[in-house]
């Protein structure tokens, strides 16, 4: 039986390990932490449970596909669909509840934003078309293999290239709405890959289709159950885990991978899959291999500053996902990407899993995951930024919800870009690897194979096709397919 080593037990590493196990490999995962899941982790504090990382669940079939590889194994994993994706709030009192039923969304958006139904319907139809035209090429195949470009999917994408909006920004595409609030709502989808709507290409108008066309979901027991259920499955099917054992070097001979080294010794392997961020993979584990500097020096995606608050009352006007919009969205993104700091009036995201899982907070209380988009760590004074941002967030909540939330916070845990990098090795704390702030970004991400070292592969949010749960799972699928063809 051939051996495979996976570096990192994030969602991409777990998925890659399961797919390789299904191919017949003996698989060992090395993980520096004492838990599996990477960013998909959770903590409990003073009677509250908090999911630390990704909070939005879309494309659940990508998780189900992994369970389907091992139908004889029964894992407790369920989820439910959400009728409302987000509650959106503005300072002037405007509230919009975004239905995941497109017809209802069109009806409600037309009423709230005074926009023509036909305009919204056309936009959503275009979003769906872009997604269906590009998903096979951009999300399900390697963009770095010549064979990809001789497929029918590629021909379709090329024929429809003018329709995809590659030469416009997302904001250009969305400014066709008369109401700037609706433009802002759709501009927010740039943050799903850690980018600015004023720079990322118009093709990103396909992202709303994931929510408004294909639906949003909530896993029973919280987002942490996604990573935990895959961890449980991996254990059941014989994947071995070595926790608290950091890989210090990827070993090679004659430009071919031979295994890895850790503080505990050397391990031989027929192939290695790195789920570590691509920058520290080269900088720390491949010091003798010339690094692809152009790839590694790309602008990093946004990070996040997150406050986890136990709240001593309930807010019926809030749902699982809530957005309190900035009054100056463009300035907010300029601060993040150009000035590497935080705006005075940030957009605030509040995720409350106790709305779905009552055990996540004491009776009559709620667990608030309160996040603002942030730049990565470039040596800023995070202690000061945390202090200032907390005041600004409290002020934003007061404007939109008419309550001084500071009087209701019973416990607090804070995660900064520095903390994200420390916990997950994500370079500068970037949540999605490289930003997608230009039309070539998809092609400039590091491939899922290594061009210099044979039998070395890469998965996760810093490589193709990108960050977020669905794309990390797809990166594992692409990589496993490459391995099956090449080995």
Swiss-Prot record:
Group of enzyme by EC: oxidoreductase
- What is any one GO biological process for this UniProt entry? carotenoid biosynthetic process
| Presence of the UniProt keyword Flavoprotein in the record | yes
Catalytic activity of the protein: rhodopin + A = (3E)-3,4-didehydrorhodopin + AH2; 1'-hydroxy-gamma-carotene + A = 1'-hydroxytorulene + AH2; 1-hydroxy-all-trans-1,2-dihydro-neurosporene + A = demethylspheroidene + AH2; 1,1'-dihydroxy-1,1',2,2'-tetrahydroneurosporene + A = 1'-hydroxy-demethylspheroidene + AH2
MF (Gene Ontology) = nucleotide binding; oxidoreductase activity
| Keyword Cell wall biogenesis/degradation in annotation | no
Pathway recorded for this protein:
Carotenoid biosynthesis
- Keywords assigned by UniProt? Carotenoid biosynthesis, FAD, Flavoprotein, Nucleotide-binding, Oxidoreductase
Instruction: Tell me which residues bind FAD.
Output: 12, 31, 39, 55-56, 247, 275, 431, 461, 468-469
What is said about its interaction partners and assembly?
Monomer.
Function, please?
Can also use 1-hydroxy-all-trans-1,2-dihydro-neurosporene, 1,1'-dihydroxy-1,1',2,2'-tetrahydroneurosporene and 1,1'-dihydroxy-1,1',2,2'-tetrahydrolycopene. Probably involved in the synthesis of myxol, a gamma-carotene derivative. May use FAD as a proton acceptor.
| Annotated family | Belongs to the carotenoid/retinoid oxidoreductase family.
Q: What is this protein called?
A: 1-hydroxycarotenoid 3,4-desaturase
Q: Which organism is it from?
A: Nonlabens dokdonensis (strain DSM 17205 / KCTC 12402 / DSW-6) (Donghaeana dokdonensis)
**In the UniProt record, what gene is named as encoding this protein?**
crtD
